[in-house]
Design a protein with these regions (language model features):
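A structural signal for multi-pass alpha-helical bundles of membrane permease subunits
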Residues: 1-150
């Protein structure tokens, strides 16, 4: 992966971290299961009504899979946010280092400033909590509409 990132000239960029976590097997299987749970009758009815395949995807499949997309966004963000080895390998510039590498800078060979580590860890939870709270309504919609039939 590192050689591929270097050949695309994305080494030492945040985009390299995002691309390495954007298309994971978890995301593929989560979205597959989400699309398989949507009844075929909906897409067949849309085809009969004259809707194109893109229209079926954009007007039926995508809105019904909002909860799965929100889940995928949250899990991907948390995975990238908590990644330690990826930034350690792909980022060389000090100003591009992530907060996880910054937490490691509080630990020296002989001591660790635990009060600063805990304060920084608490601050690093704020974006994850904000993302979860902003995506929470999609979970509620998914649970509310999952029991509806036809």
């Amino acid at each position: 992966q590192f050689i591929m990132i270097r050949k695309m000239q994305l080494a030492d960029t945040h985009l390299s971290l995002i691309l390495m976590q954007a298309f994971t097997a978890f995301g593929v299987f989560l979205m597959r299961q989400s699309y398989l749970s949507i009844p075929n009758e909906l897409s067949e009815a849309a085809r009969i009504d004259g809707l194109s395949e893109f229209g079926i995807y954009s007007r039926i499949m995508l809105p019904l899979s909002k909860s799965a997309i929100a889940t995928l966004i949250i899990f991907s963000f948390v995975n990238v946010w908590n990644d330690y080895m990826g930034p350690m390998i792909y980022l060389n510039s000090t100003e591009l280092k992530t907060i996880q590498l910054g937490l490691r800078m509080f630990i020296t060979q002989y001591s660790a400033d635990y009060n600063l580590i805990m304060a920084a860890a608490l601050i690093s939870l704020i974006p994850v909590g904000a993302l979860f709270l902003s995506m929470q309504r999609f979970f509620i919609e998914g649970v509310a509409t999952s029991g509806l039939k036809g």
